[in-house]
């Protein structure tokens, strides 16, 4: 769905950003999935 798609975009974008932003994106992705 759109939520999962958005999380996927965050993870992909995080890889091209500085490490601090990448880590933030990972936290958002994991937190959003509730795992």
Swiss-Prot record:
Top-level class of the enzyme under EC nomenclature: hydrolase
Location in the cell: Secreted
InterPro entries: PLipase_A2, PLipase_A2_dom, PLipase_A2_dom_sf
GO molecular function: calcium ion binding; phospholipase A2 activity; toxin activity
Enzyme Commission designation: 3.1.1.4
Tissue expression notes: Expressed by the venom gland.
Protein family: Belongs to the phospholipase A2 family. Group II subfamily. D49 sub-subfamily.
Function, in words: Snake venom phospholipase A2 (PLA2) that shows presynaptic neurotoxicity. 10 ug/ml of this protein produce complete neuromuscular blockade up to 80 minutes, without inhibiting the responses to acetylcholine (ACh) and potassium chloride (KCl). In addition, it produces a calcium-dependent blockade of acetylcholine release and causes appearance of giant miniature end-plate potentials. PLA2 catalyzes the calcium-dependent hydrolysis of the 2-acyl groups in 3-sn-phosphoglycerides.
Name of the protein in its database record: Phospholipase A2 neuwieditoxin-1
Protein's organism: Bothrops pauloensis
Origin organism lineage: Eukaryota, Metazoa, Chordata, Craniata, Vertebrata
